[in-house]
Swiss-Prot record:
This is Transforming protein STP. Residues 1-41 are annotated as: Disordered. InterPro entries: Transforming_StpA/StpB (IPR016318). Keywords: Membrane, Metal-binding, Oncogene, Transmembrane, Transmembrane helix, Zinc, Zinc-finger. One of its GO terms (molecular function) is zinc ion binding. It comes from Saimiriine herpesvirus 2 (strain 11). A zinc finger (unnamed) spans 122-135. It is found in: Membrane.
Length: 164
């Protein structure tokens, strides 16, 4: 049976009327309108599962997808999960982070996908690059400050000995 213009499944792609495809899931916290989501890749880090890339504190998230090890992030109530069900738990997450539960276990180095709000997180590769750059800049800045302090102390000692 043919469908008329404007009649269609709301989950269909909107490319027919020129609109780009978007996520039509709405949050259950009273937010009106669709919220865009961006897939973010997290890597398992050893036996503790994925870490929260936003805060980089090294604390595993306490949402267990497998016995004995956390393997998922959870965010605001009612976000869509990859399996289609909605997340029903609410963990305290840093401001701006809103991710959903991910099922499955992986060994060290395996990838797991988490959906986060657009703009709240960078990809892990960008963070690692920024982290390395930040460390290099910090170390160079500390070295420059130490060298300047040594030069100032040396000049002060030279001036003091010349006055004597």
């Amino acid at each position: 049976m043919a469908r008329g213009l404007g009649e269609g499944d709301p989950q269909e792609n909107d490319e027919s009327n020129g609109d780009p495809p978007h996520n039509t899931d709405e949050r259950s916290d009273g937010d009106d309108g669709p919220t865009p989501y961006l897939p973010v890749t997290l890597l398992n880090a050893g036996p503790f599962g994925p870490y929260n890339p936003y805060c980089l504190l090294g604390h595993p998230v306490q949402e267990s997808g497998c016995p004995g090890r956390p393997t998922a992030l959870s965010g605001a109530v009612g976000l869509p999960t990859p399996s289609g069900s909605r997340s029903s738990s609410h963990l305290s997450t840093p401001v701006g982070l809103s991710a959903v539960r991910v099922s499955g276990c992986g060994g060290a180095g395996s990838e797991e996908h988490v959906y986060a709000e657009v703009g709240s997180l960078h990809s892990e590769h960008e963070q690692e690059g920024d982290k390395c750059t930040d460390c290099s800049v910090t170390i160079l800045l500390l070295l420059v400050i130490i060298v300047l302090l040594l030069i100032i102390i040396g000049l002060m000692l030279v001036i003091m000995f010349k006055k004597m």
